[in-house]
């Protein structure tokens, strides 16, 4: 177990430790009201003290293991049918289940052009487009692996745009963008695609590619996108459970840390909680436990 994970959760470990320890000592006091230490063969004071120390140490170890290993979800707000929870998981496993369990919505942050070209062999392309390491890129690769071609994805996106009357805010020239799609849509634009086994994808325009096809976003634009997501979900979510990853970290270049990204999402969701009539899950990649705590 990494020490960084323990450090991130010290406050919660401490609270849990006191709860566990209090419960054990309360139970012990009840037991000792019926029998004495001597009845169970403990008569020396040093042995009694040792017994208390063992309880303290064991409950601390149990608290650390419980919080850092087994506790994977933390509910931060709940009211009626509305709920906001933070959990460790892999958004791709949620987005591509092997069998149907229940209807779910998975939010996939994409660029404002809704590009679907994932460039892995950077030696053979000028100004690579979607990185395979982003949620956007991983989603496209998983879609293709599940039997849906890039052309089919493009077709579904275009059909939804036409059906909803969503128009681009600008069209780039070949000089501005030599590869990929050239129609740019407003930040926060959402395209709905049906997946398999009860999964619906909300593709949300979050980052804008610059002249070198590098994704760019800001904290302010992310906040606006989150507001639009809540409004869109209120009218189109059908109360389905929804999953969203941390936005603004990594290759989106907003400059936010994992902790700042989590606090931003939590703040927006709690501020506009009147729009939440379903279960909202903020997903932190399980390998990022050392970077941010679900209890922050």
Model-derived features: where do they sit?
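Macrodomain-like recognition of ADP-ribose-binding/processing modules
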Residues: 1-296
């Amino acid at each position: 177990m990494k020490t960084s994970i323990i450090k991130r959760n010290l406050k919660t470990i401490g609270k849990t430790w006191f709860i566990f320890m209090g419960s054990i000592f309360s139970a012990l006091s009840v037991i000792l009201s019926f029998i004495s230490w001597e009845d169970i063969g403990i008569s020396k004071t040093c042995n009694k003290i040792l017994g208390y120390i063992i309880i303290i140490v064991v409950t601390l170890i149990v608290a650390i293991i419980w919080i850092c290993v087994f506790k994977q979800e933390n509910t931060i707000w709940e009211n009626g049918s509305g709920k906001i929870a933070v959990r460790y998981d892999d958004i791709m496993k949620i987005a591509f289940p092997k069998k149907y369990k229940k209807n779910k919505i998975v939010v996939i942050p994409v660029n404002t052009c809704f590009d679907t070209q994932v460039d892995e062999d950077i030696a053979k392309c000028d100004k690579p487009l979607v990185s395979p390491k982003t949620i956007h890129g991983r989603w496209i690769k998983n879609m293709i692996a599940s039997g849906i071609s890039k052309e089919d994805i493009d077709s579904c996106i275009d059909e939804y745009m036409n059906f909803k009357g969503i128009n681009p805010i600008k069209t780039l020239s070949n000089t501005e963008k030599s590869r990929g799609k050239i129609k740019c849509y407003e930040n926060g634009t959402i395209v709905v695609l049906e997946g398999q086994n009860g999964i619906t994808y909300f593709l949300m325009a979050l980052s804008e590619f610059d002249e070198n096809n590098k994704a760019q976003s800001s904290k302010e634009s992310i906040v606006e996108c989150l507001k639009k997501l809540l409004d869109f979900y209120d009218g189109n979510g059908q109360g389905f459970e929804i999953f969203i990853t941390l936005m603004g970290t990594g290759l989106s270049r907003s400059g936010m840390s994992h902790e700042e990204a989590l606090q931003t999402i939590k703040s927006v969701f709690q501020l506009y909680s009147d729009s939440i009539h379903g279960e909202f899950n903020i997903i932190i990649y399980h390998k990022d436990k050392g970077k941010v705590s679900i209890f922050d």
